[in-house]
């Protein structure tokens, strides 16, 4: 009963928030809102400089691998459990996934700076 009430409340609240966001009027975009602001002075140059897409992709790849490695941090504490085989299998699966992902990125030339 409590689970059903919680799910119903969450669904209704999410639906209400979506409806409010949908029915709110769109804000007007003025030229002042789209121009860059530098401490009250006119900007010295363009604030919208292009960035390297390769750098962005390498940075996203680094973040993904970093998050996956963070999953390995509790392994020393997990080794004290009674079910050691399951812990070792899960660690091996995670490390294998990391190795396969790295090999795939390498073969797709996702880690190279030159195009």
Swiss-Prot record:
Membrane topology: Multi-pass membrane protein
Cross-referenced Gene3D superfamilies: NADH:ubiquinone/plastoquinone oxidoreductase, chain 3
UniProt GO molecular function: NADH dehydrogenase (ubiquinone) activity
GO biological process: mitochondrial electron transport, NADH to ubiquinone
Positions of transmembrane segments: 3-23, 55-75, 84-104
Function: Core subunit of the mitochondrial membrane respiratory chain NADH dehydrogenase (Complex I) which catalyzes electron transfer from NADH through the respiratory chain, using ubiquinone as an electron acceptor. Essential for the catalytic activity of complex I.
Name the record gives this protein: NADH-ubiquinone oxidoreductase chain 3
Source organism (scientific name): Equus caballus (Horse)
């Amino acid at each position: 009963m409590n689970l059903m009430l919680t799910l119903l409340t969450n669904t209704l609240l999410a639906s209400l928030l979506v409806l409010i966001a949908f029915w709110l009027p769109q804000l007007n975009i003025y030229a002042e809102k789209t121009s860059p602001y530098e401490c009250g002075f006119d900007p010295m140059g363009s604030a919208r400089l292009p960035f390297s897409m390769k750098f962005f992709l390498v940075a996203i790849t680094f973040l993904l691998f970093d998050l996956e490695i963070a999953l390995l941090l509790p392994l020393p504490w997990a080794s004290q459990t009674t079910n050691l085989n399951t812990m070792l299998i899960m660690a091996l699966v995670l490390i294998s996934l990391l190795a396969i992902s790295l090999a795939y990125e390498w073969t797709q030339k996702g880690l190279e700076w030159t195009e």
